Amino acid sequence: MTRKIIAVIPASGVGSRMQAGLPKQYLKLQNKTILEHTLEIFLAHPDIEKIVVAVAETDPFYPQVALLDSPKIQIVFGGETRAHSVFNALQVIEDDSWVLVHDAARPCLKRSDLDKLLQIDDKQGAILATPAIDTMKRADGNKIMRTEDRSTLWHALTPQFFPTRLLKQALISAFKKNLTVTDEASAMEFSGYQPRLIAGRSDNLKITRPEDLALAEFYLTQNTEKKI
């Protein structure tokens, strides 16, 4: 049976580390907002039925994003944290579907990585990730406590892909226990699941600091040139 796949884009953050005058998802790269670049990836995929975008209720910028008028996109209001925004989005998604959660500020996702993730049919779900290649230090403040074994460490990326019903239940359980949910996989882990790691590309960066903009623009330019 063909699965119903829905994408969720939490886009209600303020992006304080960007030191910009507006939330980072509305900053522009190549004459489009970061959010538009991100949405285009999912709008172009034939297996994704709908995209639910969670925005802040007081956000004055999202009505100016023309792409959000697409009939394939539904807007919901986010919550106090990213996890609550994702949970709010799940309320308008059928429980028997699968959900792809992707950061609004990751505009450089490659279709090949997305396709690899969508091939997974394991109820424990899966996430894109990259193996740690730098030496990893555990710190106490700004002092090194020890060096960690990087051979077992991965950088979690998005999208993260789960059965909607199970992710919803995992988030509810985490909220009740006041657990800190940093990504969807962490909520699933708290509920005893072991999501799979799917090796993704390192250029699927999350724009977080001002210097990330130039790098993202470079990656997007490379993508454009390859299509010509």
UniProtKB/Swiss-Prot annotation:
The keyword tRNA-binding does not apply. Keywords: Isoprene biosynthesis, Nucleotidyltransferase, Transferase. CDD domains: CDP-ME_synthetase (cd02516). It comes from the Bacteria. It catalyses: 2-C-methyl-D-erythritol 4-phosphate + CTP + H(+) = 4-CDP-2-C-methyl-D-erythritol + diphosphate. Pathway: Isoprenoid biosynthesis; isopentenyl diphosphate biosynthesis via DXP pathway; isopentenyl diphosphate from 1-deoxy-D-xylulose 5-phosphate: step 2/6. Transmembrane segments: none annotated. GO terms for biological process: isopentenyl diphosphate biosynthetic process, methylerythritol 4-phosphate pathway. Catalyzes the formation of 4-diphosphocytidyl-2-C-methyl-D-erythritol from CTP and 2-C-methyl-D-erythritol 4-phosphate (MEP). Belongs to the IspD/TarI cytidylyltransferase family. IspD subfamily. This is 2-C-methyl-D-erythritol 4-phosphate cytidylyltransferase. It comes from Actinobacillus pleuropneumoniae serotype 5b (strain L20).
